[in-house]
From Swiss-Prot:
Function summary: Accelerates the degradation of transcripts by removing pyrophosphate from the 5'-end of triphosphorylated RNA, leading to a more labile monophosphorylated state that can stimulate subsequent ribonuclease cleavage.
Enzyme class, spelled out: hydrolase
Enzyme Commission code: 3.6.1.-
Pfam families: NUDIX (PF00293)
Motif Nudix box mapped to chain: 59-80
Full protein name: RNA pyrophosphohydrolase
Lineage: Bacteria, Pseudomonadati, Pseudomonadota, Alphaproteobacteria, Hyphomicrobiales
Keywords, sorted A to Z: Hydrolase
UniProt xrefs under SUPFAM superfamilies: Nudix (SSF55811)
Cofactors named for this entry: a divalent metal cation
GO molecular-function term, one example from the UniProt record: guanosine-3',5'-bis(diphosphate) 3'-diphosphatase activity
Organism per entry: Brucella abortus (strain 2308)
Stretches assigned to the Nudix hydrolase domain: 18-171
Length: 178
């Protein structure tokens, strides 16, 4: 990777930046479809300029927080869902790098990308508990709408630089949709 300008105009060497530790959540309904939300684009974030805005819930792991706890916290903060049961935890962490034009800008300019631990859950509740805009607890809305999507469609709905992550996640959890 080559250097890129950060938010202050200084050159940023992506190799010198860490990955942000995060969790990702695949939530399946009883029909085997996956919950996906359409991201609200914030200027300067990693989705700025994207047209493929559908994604599964994800978010950062707080310092000292267990990834499984972070997954349930993020799911609630972004969707309001609490009626879920754990199906599976992916064995490996999956990394992605930001594209060059976002390096040093997105993710507050502090990270080269994310390293994600993925979890699959079954949604056991009533869809009336899903609340995205506004989400519960005074959290900022990240999605403007949501749908249940076929798992195989997910890689083509996400922003291109996260596509390989979604391909790996779908391959890992494909057997759960059957």
């Amino acid at each position: 990777m080559s250097e890129h300008k950060g938010p202050t105009g200084a050159m940023v060497d992506p190799e010198s930046l860490p990955y942000r530790p995060c969790v990702g959540l695949m939530v399946l309904n009883k029909a085997g479809l996956v919950w996906a939300g359409r991201r609200i684009v914030i200027p300067g974030d990693e989705m700025d300029g994207a047209t493929q805005l559908w994604q599964m819930p994800q978010g950062g792991i707080d310092k000292g927080e267990d990834p499984a706890q972070a997954a349930l916290r993020e799911l609630y903060e972004e969707t309001g869902m609490t009626s879920v049961s754990l199906l599976e935890e992916a064995s490996d962490w999956i990394n992605y790098d930001l594209p060059p034009h976002l390096m040093g800008l997105a993710l507050k300019g502090k990270y080269r990308g994310q390293t994600q631990k993925w979890f699959a859950y079954r949604f056991e509740g009533d869809e009336s508990e899903i609340a995205i805009n506004p989400p519960p607890g005074g959290h900022t809305a990240e999605f403007d709408c949501w749908e249940w999507k076929p798992m195989a469609d997910l890689p083509n709905l996400i922003v291109p630089f996260k596509r390989k992550v979604y391909e790996q996640v779908v391959a890992t959890f494909r057997h759960l949709a059957a």
